[in-house]
């Protein structure tokens, strides 16, 4: 018995030491947070994020901690939470709904809404997944109750506003995943009459922020479906402009074998960067027009073929990525020599970021 008592004392001593270390860790984290606030309090943008993190501490844990799912668990529940984690991952099985009575007399759109299974999502960290309630997608009563803002109580309205703010925070990063179900993939088991999803589907939302308007542009969407046999994703539908080779990017991601969520994110990131590149080119020319450096601006959808006027001189550019690779000056009014035209055309080639400076200096001598 003495050995058991010794072991029990050792365990209690270790637990006490662990608790002491955890308290020290929390104090250090608080000091670091206070120091960061003091150093960056002059920056209004940083202060806005700090206020947001204070309002949603789970978001702060999700972004800055390695294991946010354990931060919300008190000391007594840590060992229990770790013990509950299965040794092997549990395969995803969508919940089933019982077959409705008299469903044959329902309109098709109502039948789909009433019989589709609960939307499942596994794209978010477990620490915040419970905050993203998808019941509103499948429950008409909940959707009606949520959308009637005037009829809900103050506490419910505040809770709904918090959900909206949290969703907007995630969408700020430009790439978000969301769950959805294609009604075509809903099947009925002959024996039990239960509804199940034949294959998974994943939605990707891409939103590019415009610094010129301080707003997000119209979002683009990509829908992926899973192949039943190979369990890999394939490109189903998208709203990306045709000048971006979405299928080529998808086929080039991991050799065309997009299996995991990480693979899907890498594909989405490559498409997103091309959208950002197009928006950046458009923004540069729109800013030049707003500053009245150029006028009568004409852009194609890709913002690669560009024409504009500087005073009464027409300039045509061909832009690739962030570089001006071709320039033509078209003028029938001024008596320019071909040699001078060529010099000005060569001068405008190069980085798009230097275009404003070049226009101000290269063309200044023309109008003296």
UniProtKB/Swiss-Prot annotation:
- GO BP term, pick one: negative regulation of meiotic DNA double-strand break formation involved in reciprocal meiotic recombination
| Chief place of localization | nucleus
Read off the lineage from the record: Eukaryota, Fungi, Dikarya, Ascomycota, Saccharomycotina
Q: Tell me how this protein assembles.
A: Component of the heterotetrameric kinetochore subcomplex COMA, which consists of AME1, CTF19, MCM21 and OKP1. The COMA subcomplex is part of a larger constitutive centromere-associated network (CCAN) (also known as central kinetochore CTF19 complex in yeast), which is composed of at least AME1, CHL4, CNN1, CTF3, CTF19, IML3, MCM16, MCM21, MCM22, MHF1, MHF2, MIF2, NKP1, NKP2, OKP1 and WIP1. COMA binds the centromeric nucleosome-binding protein MIF2, and to the outer kinetochore MIND subcomplex.
What is this protein's function? Component of the kinetochore, a multiprotein complex that assembles on centromeric DNA and attaches chromosomes to spindle microtubules, mediating chromosome segregation and sister chromatid segregation during meiosis and mitosis. Component of the inner kinetochore COMA complex, which connects centromere-associated proteins and the outer kinetochore. COMA interacts with other inner kinetochore proteins to form the inner kinetochore constitutive centromere-associated network (CCAN), which serves as a structural platform for outer kinetochore assembly.
Q: Which InterPro entries match?
A: CENP-O (IPR018464)
Q: Which residues carry this modification: Phosphothreonine?
A: 88
State where the protein is found. Answer: Nucleus; Chromosome, Centromere, Kinetochore
The organism encoding this protein is Saccharomyces cerevisiae (strain ATCC 204508 / S288c) (Baker's yeast)
Give the protein name, as stated in the record. Inner kinetochore subunit MCM21
Give the family, as the similarity comment puts it. Answer: Belongs to the CENP-O/MCM21 family.
User: Please, what other remarks does the record include?
Assistant: Present with 952 molecules/cell in log phase SD medium.
Q: Which residues form a coiled coil?
A: 1-43
> Which CDD domains is this protein grouped with?
DRWD-C_Mcm21, DRWD-N_Mcm21
